[in-house]
Amino acid sequence: DAADYPGFDLGFADAGNKGFEALAWDARSRSLMLGKERSPMGLFSLPFPGEDGAAGVMQPFNYGNLGMRDISSLSIDARTGHALVLSDESRMLLELDRSGHPVSFLSLTGGLNGLEQGIKQAEGVTMDEEGNIYIVAEPNLFYVFSKAQPDAS
């Protein structure tokens, strides 16, 4: 029964379908990173568990202008602790360091990064321990991005 478990007020009760869209676990800080889709768009950190075993206090994650129109998914690179921020409307994946500064980006536009056509509605992103990036998109599309292997010759 859900009533047996604590609830968490994440705020933005009036956001409708523009509330929290993305969620990622940050093992280094033992916190959840949450992404608010838009109006206003935002990134937040929620320590979990807090000192008393409950969720801590949600804090805004400091970042500059992301250059994105929305946030559709988040992932944390376990190797670096960097955040991967996916925007379906901007057709972009942005890497932020732990201070919120952009490190790199991956355009999801057709004609770039091996894509014949752009990824129109990217909805989810994750990364494995080797740095391969996996993106799911509507309708039922799956993409894998891997760094090119050096030529052995």
Positions of predicted regions on the chain:
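Sequence/structural signature of beta-propeller domains
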Residues: 1-153
